[in-house]
Amino acid sequence: MKRSGGLFLTSLLLTVLACTLPTTAPIVAQAPSTLASALDPVAASAPPAPGNLAEPAADLAALYREVDPGVVAIWTFGSVDGAHETSVPLGQGTGFVIDTQGHIVTNQHVVADAEEIEVDFPSGMRAWAEVLGTDLDSDLAVLKVDVPADRLFPLPLGDSDQVQVGETVIAIGNPFGLSGTMTSGIVSAIGRTLDSERASPGGQPFSSGDILQTDAAINPGNSGGPLINLQGEVIGVNRAIRTESFTVSGDAANSGVGFAIPVNIVKRVVPSLIEEGHYDYPYLGVSSLSQSTLNLNTLERLKLPADTVGIYVTCVAAGGPADQAGLRGAGACENGDLLPGGDLIVAIDGHSLETFNDLISYLVSSTQVGQQIVITVLRQGEEVELTLSVGARP
């Protein structure tokens, strides 16, 4: 049967594993870690960053030895209708240690619907975990295990704002249950946008910005594992793959296009998940698209200048922050048709914006709920400044 391409979350359902691996004895996975002491750069017990070695192959071998102890395999269990056992395997993914207090970062979709969660460490140690908090928007979750601090190896967190296209990276995880697997590649692109795991009041999914794209092989089971630079720092959390390839059993297979949540989002979201169990995302209440994605015919129909970049507002949510501030949409809230009349957002607080990702990135990294911001829009050829109070995503 011919299958069309699509985007796949990379946790591994055990119905897939059952075709190739026994579910009675899960394969132990390696554990990465970082985010120590509420996101201090490196935990006290974190292994030192690998030195500069002469041979690239030796570099990667040393890097693996340093970071692998911080990567863990995550197994989820729950109830299934018709099952005789009280708890049956549901799925498997990857996570990494972020501090010596037992906090582990993974994807939200890895632990969704789990009633019990087992964490397997590279040393052979296993522990039950509890979920402290989840975030559907970023697809992040924080787990807590009761493990002695001297047996945890937190991974240092890097700075995803410094990531460059072409930079060499590695991914460590448990693809198809093969624990401790390392793959390497490069950062293929930065600033991608992915749909959130939840929908806005209008029915369209919220968006996650600043997503990293990599060609390092990411497959089912890699979800929640770290994307690591050559300095041994986590720069992203592996989340999804886009593929047109499938295994003989019908499962999505890697085709060189993987996506990772930037670590700077992790730094911002995870402390709130630990303390409060959730994170409130800044919210404007608009649907929009990058003007750069429109061709000349569309620009002329919408009466937009071809020499100005920005974010075209297609819809403004009634009663939302943008609506209260007087932002104008094109009235495409119901049918999604591209109509003229919407504002073109060109700046926030004096910072120029060119793409929809720029808008999402600025809101998440530079604003918080309740903050007053100034939005500059192009309206009928004139620049207009509007003051807006940032809301929280409903």
Task: Enumerate the language-model features and the residues they cover.
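Serine-dependent protease modules
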Residues: 24-309, 356, 364, 370-371, ...
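Bacterial signal peptide processing site
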Residues: 20-22
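Surface-exposed loops/turns
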Residues: 318, 368-369
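Bacterial N-terminal signal peptides that target proteins for export
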Residues: 1-9
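Acidic, Ser/Thr/Gly/Pro-rich low-complexity segments that form flexible
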Residues: 315, 319, 327-330
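C-terminal motif of bacterial Sec signal peptides marking the signal peptidase cleavage site
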Residues: 16-18
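Conserved PDZ fold ligand-binding element
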Residues: 104-105, 324-357
